[in-house]
Regions:
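Cap/insert and terminal regions of metallo-dependent hydrolase folds
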Residues: 2-27, 129, 134, 159-168, ...
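Acidic/histidine-rich helix-loop elements
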Residues: 105-122, 205-211, 262-268, 296
Length: 350
């Protein structure tokens, strides 16, 4: 973990950064999570797995990496394609580039191997991934920024794209400065035929002692070949979603966080009905719920987020995309149906 003695850059003052304290904040204030509330929620999770973990590993499709091994040709207007690895990790072929979001392949979403262990094995080892052009990070929490993954790919050809402050960890783990691109909210980064724009999120960040909110959290807009996608990272519900919708005019597909919520931290993660509302606010033509299917970081059942968000999406008339782990899909793919429900029912019948 990084200690407080680590040197952090100072950035210009803004409506979400105070250079005097060197810390970021949310323009729409968060309710503070009380230590007793956090302890009362987290302590039982260390010992009780019933319903929080699926009874057996979830069904997967062996990933087809062939589109990701084609020569780069972003000028041909190819349709973006994706593979979901669980939680917030997506492999994308977009603008002729191979991009991965918030890659986590290790055993635990914490600095300790025994804490917040994954319940679903990785689809493939990180070493088996196709060549990467871009590693896109939303923020520095352990379930989104993994040191082992960064170190493995630090000296390869990939560019690391992240919000302000995350470069401190990336450099510490061996990524050369020339391979790092950082952005504040609403700043654009152009890589070949792909445009990435950091957008606001309502969250926070900490990895170690004294580093709380030293780095920024963000969602990302990905645009190439006439298609536009939204990746939420982590965010609680807020007015920023409507602003993103006004600025960008809608999205072909939105990957929106959906899981790891709790009434004790209502301003850290969205509840399922808020996930659907956020997708509507930004003008998403289709919603894919993410931030589930790999870790249990809250007390709800492992499949509750997708069950509830699916029901709310149907009520609101919002088309939903729910690919299986490992399935290759694009913004126009047909849904794989309630496969998680079938998995739960089969496990109960066994």
């Amino acid at each position: 973990m990084i200690r407080e003695s680590c040197r952090w850059p100072t950035y210009p003052a803004s409506d979400h950064y105070n250079p005097a304290s060197g810390r970021f904040f949310n323009p729409e204030p968060q309710r503070v999570v009380r230590p007793l509330d956090a302890a009362s929620a987290v302590a039982p999770m260390m010992f009780r797995r019933k319903d929080r973990f699926p009874p057996q590993p979830l069904p997967v499709i062996a990933p087809d990496f062939s589109p990701f091994r084609q020569p780069e040709n972003g000028a041909n207007g190819e349709t973006a394609r994706f593979i979901w690895f669980g939680h917030s990790t997506l492999l994308a072929r977009i603008g002729g580039l191979n991009l991965i979001t918030d890659p986590v392949f290790g055993a635990a979403a914490s600095p300790y191997r025994w804490m917040f262990r994954r319940f679903q094995p990785p689809l493939v080892p990180a070493a088996a991934l196709p060549p990467l052009d871009v590693v896109l990070i939303s923020h520095g929490h352990y379930d989104h920024l993994e040191e082992a993954f960064v170190r493995r790919f630090a000296t390869g050809g990939a560019l690391f794209v992240a919000p302000l402050g995350v470069e401190v960890w990336l450099k510490r783990w061996g990524v050369p400065a020339e391979r790092i691109r950082i952005a504040d909210w609403y700043q654009q980064i152009r890589i070949g035929h792909l445009t990435l724009t950091a957008v606001p999120a309502r969250h926070d960040c900490a990895r170690g002692i004294g580093d709380r909110n030293r780095s920024l959290w963000a969602g990302w807009v990905l645009a190439a070949a006439g298609e536009q996608f939204y990746f939420s990272g982590d965010s609680s519900y807020g007015r920023h979603f409507a602003e993103i919708g006004r600025r960008f005019g809608g999205f072909d597909l939105a990957f929106v966080e959906n899981g790891q919520y709790d009434r004790r931290w209502p301003d850290n993660h969205m509840f399922p009905h808020q996930t659907v509302q956020a997708a509507l606010d930004i003008g998403a033509r289709r919603l894919m719920p993410i931030h589930w299917g790999m870790f249990s970081l809250a007390r709800h059942a492992w499949d509750e987020p997708v069950r509830r968000s699916s029901a709310f999406a149907r009520q609101r008339g919002l088309p939903l995309l729910t690919p299986m782990l490992g399935e290759l899909f694009d913004s126009r793919s047909s849904s794989s149906g309630d496969w998680w429900q079938n998995a739960a029912e089969k496990a109960k019948a066994a």
